[in-house]
Every structure is written in structure tokens, then in C-alpha cells.
Amino acid sequence: MIKRFAQCLREYKWTALVSPVCMIGEVAMEVTIPLVMADLYDYGIAVGNMTVVWQKALQLLICAIVSLMFGVMSANYASKAATGFARNLRHDMYYRVQDFSFSNIDKFSSASIVTRLTSDVANIQMAFQMMIRMAIRCPMMLILAMVSSMRISPKLSTVYFIAIPILAAVLLGIVPLVFKIFDRVFKTYDRLNTVVQENVHGIRVVKSFVREDKEVSKFKTISGSIYDDFCKAEHILALNAPVMQICVYACILTISWVGAKMVVASGNNAALGLTTGELSSMFTYTTQILSSLMMLSMVFVMVIMSQAPLRRCYEILQEEPNLTSPENAVEEVPDGSIDFENVSFRYSRKAKRPALQDVNLHIPSGATVGILGSTGSSKSTLVQLIPRLYDVTEGSVKVGGIDVKDYDLEVLRDNVAMVLQKNTLFSGSIKENLRWGNANATDEELIHACKLACADEFITSFPDGYDTHIEQGGSNVSGGQKQRLCIARALLKKPKILILDDSTSAVDTHTDAMIRKAFKEEIPGTTKLIIAQRISSIQDSNIIIVMENGQVACVGDHETLMKNSDFYRGIYESQQKGSED
């Protein structure tokens, strides 16, 4: 894990190394200052030697300035390294998510991915920034201050060997308790993000069903759970401070009592025992030693807090995409013919029954294919295997006579355009959204595609036309308008295969008929697969596939199915009766 995260330093590697080096310089100066202070008192103030006073005062000033410079440099480099590390980590995770297949994404909820890319990375950044400074400062301060105090008085320094184990024992007792709590906190954050995202995306539904109070209550419950867990963690961590203070005060009192007796006994003579200046230095070293332990405990706490985010981010980085392009991949799709050969598919190995079973189909290039079936009959699953959004569990899917697994993924998906059930538009102008289909499309091509999708009429009715701004998720256009924009975007790809997954359900029958007519006249060479609930949307198709319980129930054109399929005929008659009513 450490090796993988270290790769995120990249161009900030040297910056991350310079910060601890500067910190060593700062600590060295801080440890030197008490020694200079002792000499200032013992050899200057105590004996009235102003030359020594001025010399030591100048040394103190130099030490303070150098310490300040090193401290500022260390903080600056640490900030740059931590910010750069977080940026690279976030980029690596985001790029990895872009390579995920649908089955990879199914392992993580969208809310969990958002949390990992935002708050988890922010927590890791703070921990990293503290570590590259304090993880060096604390041990260095502890060691140098201990050595300096041992040189002054080994007898007084023994008090540290009592205080340090006590603090270490408290810390070791706190760590496992707090780790469990913080691990639970970050999982709860995922639930909180899920609630927020669902509420924001479905705000119209929430308001139409007057569920505001219910949503507020749900949010309050989860938020309260996070609050309770944080309070538990803080209560446990709070034990660290009083234990630390007790140890500090106990050490200072012990050194004051024993040290004062040593100063009096020696007559303030260093050769015979201890001087007043050395005793004052011992007080400073006591504070430095125990405060370094306190800071070290804070580092441990921060490391504990970052363990859960580190593990969660590592899961993203280590998740291998299930779908990759093979070596020597096919770089060209010959035509739009499609073959399903003994295809079975399960969304997971644990699934009790397959979503698709024993599917055998041949669709010639340029054909118009209608797909019909009840809810849950795996119509969408069937077409998602064509651009290899999932891999089949058994059998094979072929496009242009070649197994989809043999294609370069980009090449295959560039030649297959899908308009999904859930239409997605992005914030930006209509032009920017359309150019997702073809970044280099001219304005004339945009207009032509929109005319085929019957979208040009309503676009030109907007004051800004094709420059009209689309809100996030397309919230400022109707469902039918959104569908037509998505169809136009797909047409701009000029694909060999066009898949419409119930993509005209929100448009009226007249517009639906106009779109189908435009497809027939303008893109006759493109294989068109149309999933629909209305038979009127697909009855003029060359082939109609009826799905039932993940299997192909029957195949044929409209006339054939009306004669041979009771299921198809029943749907047709019920829809005809409904339209008459």
C-alpha cells in the first residue's frame, strides 16, 4: 500500500524530502537555544560579564532567526508536497474510475466514490502534511533534547524514563479503540452522501409527495450517528491531554525539587553538581521532550484517522478493470451485423438465476430491430453486451462477425451509439452537449442531427438557440426534449450500430413516428435496435425480438408474431384497446 501511495508524489518527491530536512535544522536550533541560555545566565548574568551577555544574546538571536527560517521553509514545502500529493492521488483515482466497467462500478456506490474522491483524500492530505513535518520533528526533538539533558544531568534525566512509558501505554490503549470508531464514521459518511445525492436529484419527487420532513428526519438520523461516533472518539482522545499534563507537571516538580537541592549543594558550581542556568535548561528540555511526545501522539491519532480513508482509496486504486482491450486488438468494425451465440449472463457469481439464458440471435447489418418484453425481462441487459459494457458469462457476442472481446474497446464503442433509459445531459450549452457525440462536428452537422431527432424545432424556439445553457442533469428541459437531444448526440457519432433503450417513451406518437421515418430514410446502413414499450414504435421493424424471463420468447416481423405469438398479440390488442379508449 505504501509503495502505491508513494507513486502519487511524482514531481513532488523532492519537495517532500526537503521539508523534513528543513525541520531537522529547525529542531537543532531549538535544542541549542536552552544551552545558550544556560551559558548566558551562568557565565554572563551571574558573574556580571557583559561581553558574554552580548555574545550569547547575539547567538540566541541567530539561532532564533535560523530556526524561524527553517520552520517557514519546512511548512511551505510540506504544504506544497501534501497539496500536490492529494492532487495526484485524486487524479489517479478519478482516472481509474474512468476505466471501470459497469461491473466494477457496481461494487462501489456512486456516493461512496464521491466520498473517497473528496473527503477521504482531504483527510489523507492533512495526515500526510502533518506526518512529513511532525514525524521528523517529534523523534528528532525527543532524541536531541534527551541527549542534551543527559549531558547536563544524567540523574535528573531518569525522570523521563518513568514518564515516557506511561504516555506510551496510554497511547497504545487509545489507538485500537479510536480506529474502530473512525472506520465506522467513514462508512456512515457514504450513507450520508447517498441521502444527500438522492434528495438533490429527486427534489421534485420529494416535494410532489410532500416528503420533506421524512427526508430531513433521515438526514438528521445519519448526521446524528456521525456526531455520536465523533464524540465517542473525542472522549477517548481527550484522555491523552490530562495524562500528558500530569506527566509534564510531575516531571517539572521533580526536577525543580531535586534540581534545586543539587544547585544548593553544589554552590551553583557545574563541576560539583548543577548550576542555575543548567537547571533552567532542564525545564526547557522537559517541556520539549514531553511536548514532542504529545505531538507524536497527535501524529498517531492523525494516522489512525487516515487509516480508513487510505484503505478506501487504495481499494479504488487497486480495483482492476474487468474489461480491457486485448493484445493485437481489432482496430476496425467491418459492419453492423450482430450475433448472439449461446449467450448466458449473470451480474454476479452469487446470482441465483442468470439475467440472460441461452440467447441465440442473428441481426444483419442495416436492419431495424425492435425489442419488446415485460419489465425485468433483461431487454437492456441484452443490448449492453453489444458495446461490451459487460462480458458474457457463457457464449459469445459478435459484431461484424468478430467477437466483441477481440476489439479495441474504444474502437468498438465508437461504432456503437447508445441512448440509455436514463438520459443524461451535462451542464453547459446545447452545442457542448451535442459534441459529446463528435467533438469535431460542424454547426451544420449538429443541426442536421437535431432535425433527424426532431429536436431542432424546440431548440430554435429558445432565445439563445443552440447556445442555450443546460442545467446540471438537464433540469431545465422536458423529458421528451432531453430524449431527443440524447438521440441527436448519438447520431453525431455516425455509428454502425444505434441502440435506443426505451428512448422515445417521453415523446408523443407523432414525433416518435417522425424520428423512425428519419432513421429509415437518412441512416439506412446503420443497424438500429429499438427497445420500446409501445408496439407502434417497433411494428415496422425488420425483426422484432420478444423477451421473457431473460430468454428470447419469439422472433419475427409484426405480421409473423401476430399469427404465431399469443404473448405479442395480447400486448398489441391491449394497447390498441387502450388507445381507442
Feature locations, PLM:
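Transmembrane helices of ABC transporter permease
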Residues: 11, 15-28, 39, 63, ...
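Short intracellular "coupling" helices and adjacent cytoplasmic loop segments at the cytosolic face
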Residues: 47-48, 83, 91-115, 119-121, ...
